[in-house]
Amino acid sequence: MPELPEVETSRRGIEPYLVGHSIQYAVVRNARLRWPVSEQILALSDQPVLSVQRRAKYLLIELASGWIIVHLGMSGSLRMLAEETEAGKHDHVDLVISNGMTLRYTDPRRFGAWLWCDDLATSNVLAHLGPEPLSEAFTGAYLYEKSRNKRTLIKPWLMDNKLVVGVGNIYASESLFTAGILPDRPAGSLSKVEAEVLVATIKAVLLRSIEQGGTTLRDFLQSDGKPGYFAQELQVYGRAGEPCRACGTPIESAKHGQRSTFFCPRCQR
């Protein structure tokens, strides 16, 4: 599933082609995504694009009349293409832009979403989200305070969007490894020092992935059609049985909250 770095990479890639131009119209080949494509998107006509933002794993395209909210789901990606580029089997939504380009949404598994919102303050999907992990609001003190008396395992706890947004399966595993913290410890066992280290590590891992264009394990592509190169730097995720890059101990895996977790039993405590 595309996580925060992949969504931010997509945002940065499409923004220069959208802002200052207009969406002439939308082409929807298959409206049966996770939720049906909103009727307001189907009816778009000559709508100026004011900004392209991100909140958690949602892309927010601001128009003069409202907002398009895009979620990439499990396998979605966005590309900027020449308007005449022929569509493929899994290309479900196009936004035709006034500069001769098309924003194309590809999603083999169709778990993504294209929604409309008149006002973000009233959006149900954006309500109750925690702070952005790269913001000043996400601090060691915040994480430590939230962890008090929590028996939930650290790994699934970090993936709760009410705690902090955008730290998905890949980056939770990678951050815990880099911070030297076992994923199956209770969240309440974090010390103040560990909370500070973990927050700094999460920020560093996410920023590094954004620099590398995100992580491509299967379907994700950047807006220019290239894969995300952070996959080449993964320390533990998807490496069960392979030697730890730091100590040589075989990487282990476990199921936490029905999600696969990867860790080094020697480097993490």
Swiss-Prot record:
The UniProt catalytic activity note for this protein reads:
Hydrolysis of DNA containing ring-opened 7-methylguanine residues, releasing 2,6-diamino-4-hydroxy-5-(N-methyl)formamidopyrimidine; 2'-deoxyribonucleotide-(2'-deoxyribose 5'-phosphate)-2'-deoxyribonucleotide-DNA = a 3'-end 2'-deoxyribonucleotide-(2,3-dehydro-2,3-deoxyribose 5'-phosphate)-DNA + a 5'-end 5'-phospho-2'-deoxyribonucleoside-DNA + H(+)
Q: Where does DNA bind?
A: 90, 109, 150
The annotated active site, in chain numbering, is 2 (schiff-base intermediate with dna), 3 (proton donor), 57 (proton donor), 259 (proton donor)
Q: Which UniProt keywords apply?
A: DNA damage, DNA repair, DNA-binding, Glycosidase, Hydrolase, Lyase, Metal-binding, Multifunctional enzyme, Zinc, Zinc-finger
Q: Which InterPro entries match?
A: DNA_glyclase/AP_lyase_DNA-bd, DNA_glyclase_Znf_dom_DNA_BS, Formamido-pyr_DNA_Glyclase, FPG_cat, MutM-like_N-ter, Ribosomal_uS13-like_H2TH, Znf_DNA_glyclase/AP_lyase, Znf_FPG/IleRS
Write down the Gene3D superfamilies for this protein, in alphabetical order.
1.10.8.50, MutM-like, N-terminal
Q: What is its EC number?
A: 3.2.2.23, 4.2.99.18
Which Gene Ontology biological process is one annotated for this entry? Answer: base-excision repair
User: FPG-type zinc fingers: which residues?
Assistant: 235-269
Q: Bound how, and how many: what does the cofactor note say?
A: Binds 1 zinc ion per subunit.
Q: Which cofactor does it need?
A: Zn(2+)
Q: Which GO terms describe its molecular function?
A: 8-oxo-7,8-dihydroguanine DNA N-glycosylase activity; class I DNA-(apurinic or apyrimidinic site) endonuclease activity; damaged DNA binding; zinc ion binding
What family does this chain come from, according to its entry?
Belongs to the FPG family.
Describe the function of this protein: Involved in base excision repair of DNA damaged by oxidation or by mutagenic agents. Acts as a DNA glycosylase that recognizes and removes damaged bases. Has a preference for oxidized purines, such as 7,8-dihydro-8-oxoguanine (8-oxoG). Has AP (apurinic/apyrimidinic) lyase activity and introduces nicks in the DNA strand. Cleaves the DNA backbone by beta-delta elimination to generate a single-strand break at the site of the removed base with both 3'- and 5'-phosphates.
Subunit structure of this chain's protein = Monomer.
- Name by which UniProt lists this protein: Formamidopyrimidine-DNA glycosylase
